[in-house]
Amino acid sequence: DYLIVGAGLFGAVAAYRAARSGKKALVIDRRPHTGGNAYCEEREGIRVHKYGAHIFHTSNREVWEFVNRFVEFNNYINSPVANYKGKLYNLPFNMNTFYAMWGVTTPAQAAEMIDRQRHEAGISEPRNLEEQAISLVGIDIYERLVKGYTEKQWGRDATQLPAFIIKRLPVRFTFDNNYFNDRWQGIPIGGYNKLVDGLLAGVEVRCDTDFFADRTHWESLCDRIVFTGRIDEYYDFRLGELEYRSLRFEHETLDTPNYQGVAVMNFTEREIPYTRIIEHKHFEPGGDQPRTIITREYPAPYEHGAEPYYPVNDQRNTKLYESYKALADRDRKVIFGGRLGE
């Protein structure tokens, strides 16, 4: 009944729901494993997030109860730290951040500092991302914690990026380092692989299988396709190619039990080529292994053959995506979903 292209979280949930409703589903994935970008592998007794950090969080009770049918979650709270030229700041922007930056100790002092810088900038109609960010949080936070990180992420100067990329920058006037506001968060005990394996139990799965290598064959097998890859690739780029950004992950095993003391540290100066370092053992309790594994995350331009990780969010890309979405809305054969499909 269903061919599901992509064995990540969206594809796995689609397969589970199809099976539960009495439909037959076949899941294919060109990678040698299931789980998509949430896939983990174990090294040195440490569960490594192979494609970057993934922290599950939701305020939807139905979603939380659903995933807990398959796996329990630990009590990990995402509290990343930003490193700017060797000085550390808590994220998201909160009273700990403002104390480290200005020495202020009360919410009123912090709010006054931010408001003063916003008004000194005198930006009423931001023309680009830089002006938008400064108009929201002032020059100090922008220069130290937003500018370099954002420019590395998008591969462009902040003055060349559209203002609408940043709708808001969350500012908290409490000493709360919890990055998310959601009711529930955590990491699956046993890893995301355990969650995905539970979702795919009893479903036929074929890895190392490329949909586009024999598209006619795969399309002939099913009534509907659930597609979690690139929407423009599905339609043979007939309207043009969407622009994506890629990532490169550099994994390293170190002869120290604790490298940075936190799971995620962002490096916000432009001169450091990576955006963050992940120390995987801190995602789970314990962490008493004699060695540690870190991953440096490097943003990169997308080139054919590389992995597209996220779309470039500018006016051209958004307009082109809307054209592809209009095609999809008229297409009764396919359902798009997932990070790339949507």
Regions found by a protein language model. Give the residues of each.
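Active-site/ligand-binding neighborhood in enzyme catalytic cores
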Residues: 85-89, 95-224, 228, 235
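Dinucleotide-binding Rossmann-like beta1-alpha1 core, especially the glycine-rich loop
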Residues: 44-120
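Mid-domain catalytic core of redox enzymes
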Residues: 212-322, 327
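Glycine-rich FAD pyrophosphate-binding loop
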Residues: 19-44
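Short, solvent-exposed loop/turn segments at secondary-structure junctions
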Residues: 9-10, 32-34, 96, 151, ...
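Short FAD-binding loop at a beta-strand-to-alpha-helix junction that anchors the flavin cofactor
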Residues: 328-342
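Short loop/edge segments at beta-strand edges and connector loops
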Residues: 6, 77, 205-210, 338
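N-terminal Rossmann-like FAD-binding beta1-loop-alpha1 element of flavoenzymes
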Residues: 2-27
